[in-house]
Amino acid sequence: AEAHVAFLDQQLKDFQAQHPALAATFDYSRRFTTYRPVHFSGKVRKDITLYCHLDTVNKEAPPKVLVWQKGTPLKIDVWQLPGAGTAEDTMFLLRRDNGEEYGMKGRLVLRDDVHALMHRPGTESFGASIDTKDNDLPSGEYMLSIMTWTSAGDLLQSTPLLHVTIP
């Protein structure tokens, strides 16, 4: 199994070397990076609320402060409710205390529990999650929030959901 994983890793590295323009996109879907898709580079609507709830961090109740050690995985699950439209794409955003930002593509997931609670068409896919395998971010203090591109063409951002410390 380890040899097969090594083979697949090498295959991915070879592909990225042949297609350098795609490397940033690949990284963005696997870890926090400075890359940001064009639709997440526009102006955030302040007049429309993005309601978010942090469900779990590493499959447990969220801590007040997450200490995320270098080289360790991280899994975060949230549900979100845009004030207008439905979620089309989601990015998890870590903003460092010095203003630097790192984003990672969120995966939209079905949340039947949220849909049952909201009784609103289109809320089935309002869950989002990330599952990163490692952490190579600079040491420092960060705040985690969610950015969502909606079906109405609006860019929304949640209030900070979690304080993250990387030693």
Q: Where do the PLM segments sit?
A:
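Extended low-complexity, serine/threonine- and proline-enriched intrinsically disordered segments
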Residues: 84-105
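Aromatic sugar-binding surface patches on proteins
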Residues: 111-132
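Beta-strand-rich extracellular modules
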Residues: 147-151
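Short beta-strand elements
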Residues: 153-167
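A short tyrosine-centered beta-strand micro-motif
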Residues: 140-145
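Surface-exposed, short loops/turns at beta-strand junctions within beta-sandwich domains
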Residues: 134-139
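Short edge beta-strand/loop segments characteristic of extracellular beta-sandwich folds
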Residues: 75-83
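Intrinsically disordered, polar/acidic, low-complexity terminal segments
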Residues: 1-75, 163
